[in-house]
């Protein structure tokens, strides 16, 4: 599961 927003992944 992805427990973060796109901002954290970018």
Curated annotation (Swiss-Prot):
Keywords: Apoptosis, Disulfide bond, Glycoprotein, Plant defense, Toxin. One of its GO terms (biological process) is defense response. Glycosylated. GO terms for molecular function: toxin activity. Significantly inhibits growth and induces an apoptotic response in HeLa cells through cell-cycle arrest at S-phase. Exhibits highly cytotoxic activities against cancer cell and non-cancer cell lines producing IC(50) values of 0.15 nM for human cervical carcinoma cells (HeLa), 7.71 nM for rat pheochromocytoma-12 cells (PC-12), 11.20 nM for human breast cancer cells (MCF-7), 15.80 nM for human leukemia cells (K562), 2.79 nM for African green monkey kidney cells (Vero) and 3.92 nM for normal Madin-Darby canine kidney cells (MDCK). Heterodimer of an A chain and a B chain; disulfide-linked. This is Malanin chain B. It comes from Malania oleifera (Garlic-fruit tree).
């Amino acid at each position: 599961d992805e427990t973060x927003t796109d901002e954290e992944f970018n």
